Amino acid sequence: MTNTETAVFGMGCFWSAEELFRKIKGVISTEVGFMGGTVKNPTYGQVCRGKSGHIEVVNITYNPKIVKYTDLLNLFWNNHDPTTPNRQGWDVGEQYSSHIFYFTEEQRLLAEKSFEKIQKSSDLRIVTAIKKASDFFPAEEYHQKYFMKKNNSILNF
């Protein structure tokens, strides 16, 4: 297997985020799930009821020789609204908040640098949280590759 790295982003509904990233050249795999909460192995229901503190995230395994972490960050920033706390479009709740979870010091620094750049270009306050990655809990199978399974052509990234 090639040298791979992992990126995890929370940017609203994880179905849309996964659909965006899974199509990128250099992305080896994607998986939707939850990160950042206090309950071990939360269910989708627990997360949606606000009982676990988790964020809906997409877990991305990628080849850094083909796609850079900064490229993934740019996709993250350009495909959701980082100025709305606990909300993306019609989806409202803590689980939909904007998050970058980092695994390495380099990822943290790149995330913070990108945050500063976005903040300087915005009249609104950026509310994206940048946090050290914690345990990732995969969502139930029916959430995985949701739009691919549904053959939904509504999303055109």
UniProtKB/Swiss-Prot annotation:
Q: Which InterPro entries does the UniProt record give?
A: Met_Sox_Rdtase_MsrA_dom, Met_Sox_Rdtase_MsrA_sf
Q: Which GO terms describe its biological process?
A: protein modification process
Reactions catalysed: L-methionyl-[protein] + [thioredoxin]-disulfide + H2O = L-methionyl-(S)-S-oxide-[protein] + [thioredoxin]-dithiol; [thioredoxin]-disulfide + L-methionine + H2O = L-methionine (S)-S-oxide + [thioredoxin]-dithiol
Catalytic residues, chain numbering: 13
Recorded GO molecular functions are: L-methionine:thioredoxin-disulfide S-oxidoreductase activity; peptide-methionine (S)-S-oxide reductase activity
- SUPFAM superfamilies cross-referenced by the UniProt entry: Peptide methionine sulfoxide reductase (SSF55068)
Keyword Oxidoreductase among record annotations: yes
Which EC number(s) are documented for this chain?
Answer: 1.8.4.11
One Pfam annotation reads PMSR
Q: Which residues cross the membrane?
A: none
UniProt entry keywords in alphabetical sequence: Oxidoreductase
What job does the chain carry out? Has an important function as a repair enzyme for proteins that have been inactivated by oxidation. Catalyzes the reversible oxidation-reduction of methionine sulfoxide in proteins to methionine.
Q: Which family does it belong to?
A: Belongs to the MsrA Met sulfoxide reductase family.
Q: What is this protein called?
A: Peptide methionine sulfoxide reductase MsrA
